């Protein structure tokens, strides 16, 4: 059988996609016949055009042949088959409507797409001739001629030594390998430069001026290679981490005025203050000079302990300080005595406890009818009698704030017994 040319293309299609190239793989060389080969015509085909998978040197006495997509002869890879007797054509599950098989076993693929790239298997069956028949498999691979790649970046303006960058070589190309270049040299592997499993993605950790680029990526397959235009990262100056200075870390509630200062000072920065992870809202209580680097908090309360952070920003981004939390001294508040009931019977046990909000913890003392009894939060008198009736007072004191407070209850003890 002579070669069969693919039908001429009557419409000219401008190539915008990927060229497809056939690489030839030769198989099965029976001793009395010429070598069977498969080639693509044309050798390079544009996406949207037609390609003929032309078969040479078919053996004689054929019963038929089957084309499969891929290297496996599974049913769902079955494209089409040709039966010599009756010249019948049968289509399989992998038939797309664009394939046409000829009597010489050649396969025409029309309107080629990128999905058509890859391996094809021709299954040849000879008639039974006393030896049970002969079956041969012939495989070739249709490669994508690599397009010119481009590099996409997660961040073209990284902060020096502070930010990571992810570079990706586009497009994703089947059956191709990826290679990266930096400063015109093959990419060195360091702890700052790491590649993905496919090499298509490059991770740059903590970009410095020495690894800012230019970067290029290359897409390569067995028939071609293409390199991208260079991409250089615009390295931004490093922002030094700010810190907060404060005139008093242990202010007294409603008494001390606090002044926070965000360091360092620079005309190139914008300053932002944060409280409890939220941007500090404008409030009449909070005073901020026009540059916002200083924060003045008069009459601090226990609800304003923080944490506080300051942030410095330039037009590309910002960085926050470590948090600062205040130790606001307060109290003691008016104490509470538990339990609150005041009537007891003779012989009962008396247990009283006292509590007052205070920072640091308050000192407690008890008096009965003005006479000191003990120091501590709890007062216990077993088997009380009527002589224990009187005014019980809990006094609390905070040595840090210098404040004192007290609470009293009247306890009445009776010999009266319920019937």
Curated annotation (Swiss-Prot):
Disulfide bonds join 169-217, 262-310, 354-394. Belongs to the immunoglobulin superfamily. CEA family. Residues 1-34 form the signal peptide. The gene is PSG4. This is Pregnancy-specific beta-1-glycoprotein 4. Its main location: secreted. SMART domains: IG, IGc2. It is found in: Secreted. Residues 147-234, 237-327, 332-410 form the Ig-like C2-type domain.
